[in-house]
């Protein structure tokens, strides 16, 4: 379990990363004005120091800044600027899944929503790994990655099927047995929620291990067809929802 000082450092680094993500596309004056409207008056000099890491905000200030960044719509502006959908309804998920600005904003949002609530972060290879890694670090949780193939013939695995519709086929996810422990609180993290099939398979893996899902985090959601797969009682955090007619 991380020490209190480690947790404070993580919070400060998340704040600094979120501010840097904002500065990639938003003027410093607009950031300062928005924060001031929420009662956080920060001088341009201090804002610059926080952004580039020459000086870190105190932990309580860092928490207040993160809450303001996500509560004010500033983080949403960044995501909306970077999401694109082509004429075929294809979302640029692979690019977003490796965009450090987006990942830092998503990880800090997950921290605000799930700090102290998750023992493990579970994802499916491969696009979900970057975000899941950052979220696991932010929460001080272990990382569990389910893959499409068995990596060893002698290891035992927990397995879940995924039924694909186009073309009709069956895929599988495999997680080495013992990675998740009975009674652990699991946060499922993925790059995209669309059909809910991957989410349902990851949920079955967690349940087969005797763990239970406390929440779901995703960079993007397309439509609402995935919501049936959310485990009862689990919280959901989606950075941005795209309205297109396509299936995954």
Residue ranges, per PLM feature:
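The alpha-helix within a helix-turn-helix
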Residues: 32-37, 66
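Short, glycine/charge-rich flexible loops or terminal/linker lids adjacent to PRPP-binding catalytic cores
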Residues: 141-186
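Short glycine-rich phosphate-binding loop at a beta-alpha junction
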Residues: 117-125
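Residues within the helices of the helix-turn-helix
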Residues: 28-33, 45
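Recognition helix of helix-turn-helix/homeodomain-like DNA-binding domains
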Residues: 36-57
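Active-site-facing substrate-recognition patch
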Residues: 9-29, 51-117
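Active-site/ligand-binding-proximal alpha/beta "capping" segment
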Residues: 181, 188-208
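PRPP-dependent phosphoribosyltransferase catalytic core
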Residues: 2, 7, 204-248
């Amino acid at each position: 379990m991380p020490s209190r000082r480690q947790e404070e450092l993580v919070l400060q680094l998340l704040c600094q990363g979120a501010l840097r993500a904002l500065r990639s596309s938003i003027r410093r004056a607009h950031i300062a004005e928005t924060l001031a409207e929420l009662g956080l008056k920060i001088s341009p000099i201090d804002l610059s120091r926080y952004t580039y890491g020459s000086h870190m905000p105190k932990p309580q200030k860092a928490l207040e800044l993160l809450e303001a960044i996500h509560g004010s719509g500033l983080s949403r502006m960044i995501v909306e600027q970077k999401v694109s959908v082509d004429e075929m309804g294809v979302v640029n998920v692979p690019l977003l899944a490796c965009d450090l600005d987006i990942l830092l904003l998503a990880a800090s949002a997950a921290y605000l929503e799930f700090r102290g609530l998750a023992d493990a972060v579970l994802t499916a290879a491969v696009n979900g790994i970057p975000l899941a890694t950052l979220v696991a670090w932010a929460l001080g949780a272990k990382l569990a990655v389910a893959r499409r193939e068995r990596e060893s013939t002698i290891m035992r695995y927990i397995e879940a099927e995924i039924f694909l519709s186009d073309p009709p086929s069956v895929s599988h996810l495999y997680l080495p047995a013992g990675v998740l422990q009975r009674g652990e609180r699991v946060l499922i993290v993925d790059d995209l929620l669309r059909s809910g099939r991957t989410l349902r398979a990851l949920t079955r893996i967690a349940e087969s291990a005797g763990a239970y899902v406390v929440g779901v985090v995703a960079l993007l959601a397309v439509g609402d067809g995935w919501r049936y797969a959310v485990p009862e009682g689990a919280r959901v955090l989606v950075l941005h929802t795209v309205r297109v007619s396509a299936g995954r």
